[in-house]
């Protein structure tokens, strides 16, 4: 049996959808409030998306299109991939990594779940 701390009690397909949604929201809004476990799971994926944005090749755009949700963002009516490549990636052009930070915040009132604020640096 797996370690209970590593089992998230959901299937892989569900987690893939949640991660895609959270990463897309993080890139569009700059920060999101979620549970600590989810924040830890999406940190590496968000940083990979920003690294793809820094490459700015056709192949990297296609990889980002494959992962990010294609929803119109609330920022200048651009979709999330275009916003990633045109606005977010140039900010981090000279940064080698560490594009996100996780800040632990007060536990959620209803079920006392550990909460965190994940934001772009």
From Swiss-Prot:
Keywords (A to Z) from UniProt: Ribonucleoprotein, Ribosomal protein
GO molecular function, one term: structural constituent of ribosome
GO cellular component: cytosolic large ribosomal subunit
BP GO terms, sorted: translation
A Pfam family reported for this protein in Swiss-Prot or TrEMBL: Ribosomal_L17
Signal sequence interval, chain numbering: none
Entry superkingdom: Bacteria
Cross-referenced InterPro entries: Ribosomal_bL17, Ribosomal_bL17_CS, Ribosomal_bL17_sf
Quaternary structure, from the entry: Part of the 50S ribosomal subunit. Contacts protein L32.
Family: Belongs to the bacterial ribosomal protein bL17 family.
Protein name: Large ribosomal subunit protein bL17
Organism: Metamycoplasma arthritidis (strain 158L3-1)
Taxonomic lineage from the root: Bacteria, Bacillati, Mycoplasmatota, Mycoplasmoidales, Metamycoplasmataceae
Gene: rplQ
């Amino acid at each position: 049996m797996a370690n209970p701390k590593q089992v998230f009690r959901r299937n892989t397909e569900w987690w893939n959808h949640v991660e895609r949604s959270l990463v897309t929201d993080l890139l569009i809004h700059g920060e999101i409030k979620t549970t600590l476990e989810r924040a830890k799971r999406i940190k590496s994926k968000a940083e990979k998306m920003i690294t793809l944005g820094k490459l700015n090749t056709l192949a990297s755009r296609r990889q980002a299109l494959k992962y990010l949700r294609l929803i119109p963002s609330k920022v200048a009516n651009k979709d999330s991939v275009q916003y990633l490549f045109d606005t977010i990636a140039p900010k981090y052009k000279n940064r080698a990594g560490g594009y996100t930070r996780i800040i632990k915040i007060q536990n959620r009132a209803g079920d006392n779940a550990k909460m965190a604020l994940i934001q772009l640096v």
